[in-house]
Amino acid sequence: MEIRLEDRYLREEGSVFLSGVEALVRLVVEKQRRDRVEGQVNQTYISGYEGSPLGGLDLKVVEQLDLLNQLGRTVHQFGINEKTAAAAMLGTQFAASGDVDAFWYGKAHGTMWIPDEVWLANLSGTGQRGSMVLLTGEDHRSKSSVSPGASDWVLRSSLVPTFYPANVAEILRLGLHAVALSRYTGVVTALKLVTPVCDGASTVNLDEARPQIVLPQEEYSKQFNQIVMATRALPMQQELVERKLPLVQEYLRLNEINRIVDADAGGEVGIIATG
């Protein structure tokens, strides 16, 4: 059987060999193909500011723009900095079509630049079918940063549900969940991407990496708030805290995102671990 480098993005079944950064490009491919099966393909917008461990992501996206545009309209813009890219992410949700999936990428130190934009985006919500997903590169060991960095506290303070892939395959599985959750609730979601996962590579079983997404039974009609200002923001924050976040928790429960392993072992002590 002939194997080509393009198979990492083109192959639709079986297994593919991907690096962590390549898996992020494949995530967009999977999202678009999933939409095509459902009969409505969202547009995709990607912007950010490169940095370890996501260095080179922008170039790989540009390399595959022709393929991505064959599957659905895709726009990539190099961010002047992290803040302008985050502002552009929110700006995509103003599209009249309401069908833009926006991805922001940057390292942890860049995430520290954007809490204002992310908080405003969380209050505004997303377009009718749109989503906003942050791809945060975590340089815990200060591989190419002035100091070690992590995005956890910034994301938590902005009430951003954060998925934490432990391997390359989980970038696809949890990335698709991040898009689906943002589309359903209107919240900004994030993928926490650590250096060993981004710099690593592995063979990914595509069937196992594609989740069966289950939405809560409660029908939720999200609203996109074009203007967030003064007292008008108060009911938006109430909606975020009292309606959207409980729906986030229900989504996580239904889709078994936080898995319990060996629960029947009869032990008295449990260990909680992320990633």
What are the residue ranges of the model-derived segments?
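Flexible, low-complexity linker and terminal segments
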Residues: 1-31, 165-275
